[in-house]
Amino acid sequence: EFTRVRRGAEQRRVLVVGAGEAAQLLIAQMLRSSAGYLPVGILDDDETKKGTLIHGVRVFGPTRDVQEISSALDIEEIVIGIPSATSDELSEIVHYCESLGLPLKILPGIDDVLDGEGSESRRPVLVVGGGGYIGTHLVEILLNSNYRVRVFDKFVFGRGVLGDLENHPDLEVIEGDVSNIYLLTLALRDAQAVIHLAGLVGDPASSIDDNLTQHFNIVSTRILLESVKALRIPRFIFASSCSVYGASDEKVNESSQLNPVSLYAESKIDSENEILRSAGEHFHPTILRFATVFGHSRRARFDLVTNLFTAQAFNDGKITVMGSQQWRPLIHVSDIAESIVRVLDAPIEKVSRQIFNVGDDDLNITIGELAILVARVVDRDKTGSKVDITVDDDFDDTRNYRVSFEKIQETLGFRAKIGMEDGIREMAAALEDGVYENPYYHGLYSNVQMTKLIKDEFYSKEYRETHLSILLRDLSRDDDRVTE
């Protein structure tokens, strides 16, 4: 990977080999960032590109001219950006370059392939959003399943969420977000699959700022999608949501009409459509529509209905229900992670271009029934206590859906392993053991608070200078804007 140079340090003059999409993305980010790299020339064996400019950088000729061009341009480092090249082609290019004695980087990391060690099974799985509620759980399961894992995440609340996993020899961590093309390119190098969990999650968080939601849930997904396609990474797993079904009186499945009632759901549908349209010979996406998640994770959340009810019952002795008749499909966070691994392990032709609802038919429940269940479990486990339930059925929550999970069960043999009572008891035990350092209502455990922190950064001048966003070009905002 690239060695970062401090801001203000003299820029290193870089010659880029390759003029395709991957190299173009990298050149754009080099020019935009303060990493200390200055692309001054490009080599490509396509004669029609000779003399053309890419982001203002000239294509000087074929790769065999590397010695002559490097000398003429005072090159200090060479970057090979041809992910589609064969091993023989790369070996020839590397041979030209190594004779110069200059530092040489290859995008993606094909070094292991040239050494005969780059088997598919040991190439990393990239988890975008690997520091989140689901991501931290998934990373642990992948590592335990002998995968090499690379995490790409903003870590808004700090990298402590990974805990002892950071010391695992098969884990690599890159801190940043998808719209930083330089860091994204590093994160994608030599990946065998990409699991996209990042973005603003949930209706409340996504309703804070429309531009913010569109950037992180739509624009950033497009950037990631185009980069994955350019690098010919075959497997792409996208985390969608059963909230795309909105309000429905019928039990819905993957073929049912979508009825979004929030910007969050609309953003998921937009990304689903774009991803599936991009499927092809070298790109095999899978869409996973998650049920509402519950359970303990390294990156805890108490803005999820089951976790919130459990914390209220345990700490306050009462549960407040805002609308009791709506149906929700539920699934434990560890089962979500297991479903992703199940897709990753499946033959690619079995999951390519497929949409799966992820949950279990036995875990469809109304909010009112859930509150009663939580109260009963916590009441029973806390001897001598009584949990009260307050219901406000005047609350207008248009989300109401029961979901069929027959397809994922029949296709991949997936069923939830952890039931509601066990998950509730797990959360209550963690609360009793003092696992969570702050009260359940602390902003640390809420995606709304995380979104507010990201919003401040999003509108800053520094973010605009180092991240790609079509939206930011059109927004006329003060650089020191703060959250209202």
Question: Where is each model-derived feature located?
Answer:
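C-terminal substrate-binding subdomain of Rossmann-fold SDR/epimerase-dehydratase oxidoreductases
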Residues: V321-E484
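Conserved Rossmann-fold NAD(P)-dependent oxidoreductase catalytic core, especially the SDR/UDP-sugar
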Residues: H196, R222-L263
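Conserved beta-loop-beta element that borders a ligand/cofactor-binding pocket
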Residues: S241, E272-S297, N307
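NAD(P)-cofactor binding segment of oxidoreductase domains
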Residues: H95-E98, L104, V194, I208-F236
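A solvent-exposed beta-alpha-beta segment
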Residues: F2-L114
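N-terminal Rossmann/SDR dinucleotide-binding element
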Residues: E120-A193
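Conserved catalytic-site region of short-chain dehydrogenase/reductase
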Residues: V113, D203-P204, F238-K251, L263-I269, ...
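Active-site Tyr-X1-5-Lys
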Residues: A247, N259-T286, F314-N315
